[in-house]
Amino acid sequence: MNDVVPPAAAESAAAGVSRIALGIEYKGSRYRGWQRQEAGVPSVQEALERALSKVAAEPVGVICAGRTDAAVHASGQVVHFDTAVERPLKAWVMGTNANLPADISVTWARVMPAHFHARFSALARRYRYAIYNDPIRPAHLAEEVTWNHRPLDIGRMREAAQVLVGTHDFTSFRAVQCQAKSPVKTMHHVRLLEHGRLIVLDIRGNAFLHHMVRNIAGVLMTIGAGERPIEWAKEVLEARDRRAGGVTAHPYGLYLVRVEYPGEFELPERYLGPHFLSGLPDIVG
């Protein structure tokens, strides 16, 4: 299913029309993902478009940088839309937020050149997958992290993750229903960070396949628990077969934290998120 947008929004803004970019954060727990669904099924896109349409007093459709799955969160989603309606940038932020549910927020707005595209102008995307590693499940972080009660050896996970850095065929880590034309993607870094009882998979790449981060997390947790050798990550990668890749990790711990664009667009960069990782240092690159 394609994003529901006015025809002009797909490529470049028409004459007399402004292209607006927005920063979006959301808690995805109660949504069937980013993408608009059939009537009555909640999605982040539908809620955002409805709120924007109220501010514009006309239908507004948006294009996003990356379509997140059901129950997946974002602290750094980026969207764009085209409109001939003139509103102060503050109205696109505050007015839209006034019409959004509490688990979705617009964080900034910018007027963009006509050639900016939230998806196709992006250079890289960055995700974080938060694992709460403790025998007792974290009630206050329910639906915000993945809970793993087994002791995980982060050293083993770090060593295994290094084989995923670089340009590879990630067929073993894509969902069966993935519609991407090519399974070849480039991972700039795949890091494991510690933050109290949390183990955080921090991964940055040019693009990602359907369920790719969750499948990587599943493999690394299995290795961290000692159920498979460190070399298993390489074996899974080289198999180029999803059946070799083990269990897909739960969506609750996954966050789209940043989308990177060429400097010419001068988009703001907020904290990486999620909020409970605010003390975790950012590692550039």
Model-derived regions: residue spans:
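Structured-RNA-binding interfaces characteristic of tRNA pseudouridine synthases
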Residues: 1-285
